[in-house]
UniProtKB/Swiss-Prot annotation:
CDD domains: EFh (cd00051). May function as a sodium/calcium exchanger (NCX) and participate in the maintenance of calcium homeostasis. May play a role abiotic stress responses. GO terms for molecular function: calcium ion binding; calcium:proton antiporter activity. It is a multi-pass membrane protein. Ca(2+) 2 binds at D350, S352, N354, E361. Keywords: Antiport, Calcium, Calcium transport, Cell membrane, Glycoprotein, Ion transport, Membrane, Metal-binding, Repeat, Sodium, Sodium transport, Stress response, Transmembrane, Transmembrane helix, Transport. Induction: Induced by drought stress. It is found in: Cell membrane. Its main location: membrane. This is Sodium/calcium exchanger NCL2. The chain crosses the membrane at residues 69-89, 112-132, 146-166, 210-230, 237-257, 417-437, 457-477, 494-514, 522-542, 548-568. Glycans are attached at N179, N298. Pfam families: EF-hand_7, Na_Ca_ex. It comes from Oryza sativa subsp. japonica (Rice).
Amino acid sequence: MAPPPPPTRCLPVLLLLLLVVAPLLAHGRRPFISDGGNANANANASVLRLPSAAAAAGEDMGCEMSYGFLPCTTTAWGNLFLVLAYGFLMFKSATYLSSGSEMLLQILGPGIVGGLFLPILGALPDALLILVSGLSGTKEVAQSQVLIGMGLLAGSTVMLLTLLWGSCVVVGKCDLSENSTAIDSRDTKGFSLLGSGVSTDKQTSYAARIMAISILPFIIVQIPKIFKLHSGHQITVLIGLIVAALLLLSYCLYQVFQPWIQRRRLEYTRLKHVMSGLLRHAQKHSIGRLLDDEGRPNVSVIEKLFHRIDQDNDGKLERGELQAFIVGINFEDIDWNSNLAADQVMADFDTSRNHFIEKGEFVNGMLRWLDEAKRTVTSGAYSKKFLNDFHARTRDEQTGLLDKDEEEGEADGNPTWTCIKAILLLLLGTAMAAASADPLVDAVHNFSNATHIPSFFISFIVMPLATNSSEAVSAIIFASRKKKRTLSLTFSEVYGGVTMNNTLCLAVFLALVYVRGLTWDFSSEVLIILLVCIIMGLFTSFRTDFPLWTCFVAFLLYPLSLIMVYILDYKFGWS
């Protein structure tokens, strides 16, 4: 077995990631020049415009072309198309950053890289969008566009703690026992508000407490507004910036020296790889195919596989029989012993907790795994290659250790090659995020002007979908496994994402406000962030069991947040 590459092979290249962003942002935008004479230009700007000789000569076209060549328009439909196009690019960049981060974490393990670099890279798309929202143009233009950054910051936090949190409760609900604890994989009470729900572990509540503490910088910058002070706004912005940066550093160092958060992510991806390996082996050695051409599970083949594993023919699988089957798989591409793998499968399949896997439990467990494999790998043909692709994807997220399987290829199991692939994904994701952030902000701003919808509401609703939808889909898929452990890992990721929003993204926003001398006038926006974080933070910090009715509390907070901003800004004149 080849040892994993030392961190020094990957660390220098990771340092370059921070240097890649600066040149892209420094040369990405042209100064915004407006003389107020856009009436004629606007009348002629009904289509997407490409650069022309007139543009090269500096003629005003009514809209600003990012990088001097990307199309622009002043119409609502044209800008909607641009928002969707650039939003998709931002979505792909977030996907690449997430995949590269997971792969690198598996190779290097918990430590400096996993604690310092990877959390920052995960929040990079949001941070870049916030940065470019007020980076260029006059002070007045920056003051107008920076509201897009605040909308993204508030929308991302609120979406994670309301829509995503509530969705995970709905799809992950199980029957609650007499002591209100969820029973893994048992969901017979339907949508009973009190009889079904989810449970998490204590460490998940610790992550929620860290998230609640991270709102401190928001409170600091609001002090002049709270006490109606006429001076000291810039000082409090600077203090808030310093506190946010210190909290970010503390959070990262905490993960380095107490790496339980990283280990939870590591455990999460390893479980996915064991699942994919068992499915692939079952496909190869079962009598028939596990899926037909339409992707429907073949229950008879799954039952034949059960009888093959059941060596004593007593109609149930003992742990020893399961371990013997796993030993036959010969996991050469994963640093895992058969005892641990058998424990993982027993915990996932044995829903009755009688230390046996009955035929019904085995069939249901295989059906869940196959369903998750279908949702993870988008393949047109459900052949053997389908499960091979699923296994390859989870292996890339796993250890990168040497793989001797002939079908997978020699290079895929090489840890050095996996490290290079992870870094390339990170570089590609960073470059895409840096390149598409500026055009996306411009498109949102122009769409707001064309439709007369405040840019805050557009960025609050639309932009978090571009930067967080990949993680949201993954979280919902794994919450649907209806296990306390996977739900705990899922909620920990949600709370970690909010913590990075409240530290890194807020620090970027405050730095932008302070350096450019912008006015801090975001009381209503900060208020909804504080309310949602405090309500959900207190709610999740001191309890581990959540009945189904709690999801409606989370869901209601989302529209209430939008309504509150509208009333405070447009009825009471807060902004």
